[in-house]
Curated annotation (Swiss-Prot):
GO-annotated biological processes: DNA-templated transcription initiation
Sequence repeats: 10-86, 101-177
Sequence similarity: Belongs to the TBP family.
HAMAP family: TATA_bind_prot_arch
Role: General factor that plays a role in the activation of archaeal genes transcribed by RNA polymerase. Binds specifically to the TATA box promoter element which lies close to the position of transcription initiation.
InterPro entries assigned to the protein according to its UniProt record, in alphabetical order: TBP (IPR000814), TBP_archaea (IPR033711), TBP_CS (IPR030491), TBP_dom_sf (IPR012295)
Organism taxonomic ancestry: Archaea, Thermoproteota, Thermoprotei, Thermoproteales, Thermoproteaceae
Name the record gives this protein: TATA-box-binding protein
GO MF term (any one): DNA binding
Gene name for this UniProt entry: tbp
Keyword DNA-binding (UniProt): yes
Keyword annotations from UniProtKB, A to Z: DNA-binding, Repeat, Transcription, Transcription regulation
NCBIfam families reported for this sequence: PRK00394.1-1 (NF001592), PRK00394.1-2 (NF001593)
Length: 199
């Protein structure tokens, strides 16, 4: 039997940043040609970076929401770049703002089929209603994440607060399903290659 094990890829990190100062969004919108600002429709200024590819919603209060990062390093680099950009255009933001990850979404592959009908009875805090949704919804308590598990072995993990949480949750899920006997590992493993993170 193949023991390829699980793999995953981070799809999105959502983080909040406290810039520590109030901002004049009108002035910044005039000075930043790439900024989107339409206060009648949305109270925040939108900035999009291309490297790393991240969107930021910036509010007058100095709160900022960043989405799109694929890893924590990209997130840190983006926040630094955004702070520099704001400061270069008239803001006075401290260079080391408080960054808090709110949610990490990752897709993954257990490289094995899962018997969802059996798994729902064996996992605590699991829900499976195939007539409403094809995946089993599993609320893991530690780390505190929600994992969608599909019969094909594909998974989606949400709610993690760090990359380490994702790695721990995916490996823990794999081990649990294997121990419960509801994981059918095929010889040779799948052809699809995903970026496998170290666990």
């Amino acid at each position: 039997m193949s023991s390829k094990g699980p793999s995953y890829r981070i799809e999105n990190i959502v983080a909040t940043v406290n810039l520590g100062v109030e901002l004049d969004l009108e002035s910044l919108a005039e000075r930043l040609p790439m900024a989107e600002y339409n206060p009648d429709q949305f109270p925040g200024l939108i900035l999009r970076l291309t490297k790393p590819r991240i969107s930021a919603l910036i509010f007058r209060t100095g709160k900022m929401v960043c989405t799109g990062a694929k890893n924590e390093e990209d997130l840190k680099n983006a926040v630094r770049a955004l702070v520099k950009l704001l400061n270069d255009h008239g803001a006075e933001v401290p260079f080391d703002p408080e960054v808090q990850i709110q949610n990490i979404v990752a897709s993954g592959n257990l490289h094995a089929e899962v018997d969802l009908e059996q798994a729902v009875f064996m996992l605590e805090n699991a829900m499976y209603e195939p007539e409403q949704f094809p995946g089993l919804i599993y609320r893991m308590s530690s780390p505190r994440v929600v994992i969608l598990i599909f019969g094909s072995g594909k998974i989606v993990c949400t709610g993690a607060k760090s990359e380490k949480d994702v790695a721990t949750a995916v490996q823990k899920l794999y081990n649990q399903l294997k121990e419960l006997g509801v994981l059918y590992i095929e010889e040779g493993g799948g052809e699809e290659e995903e970026e496998e993170e170290e666990m």
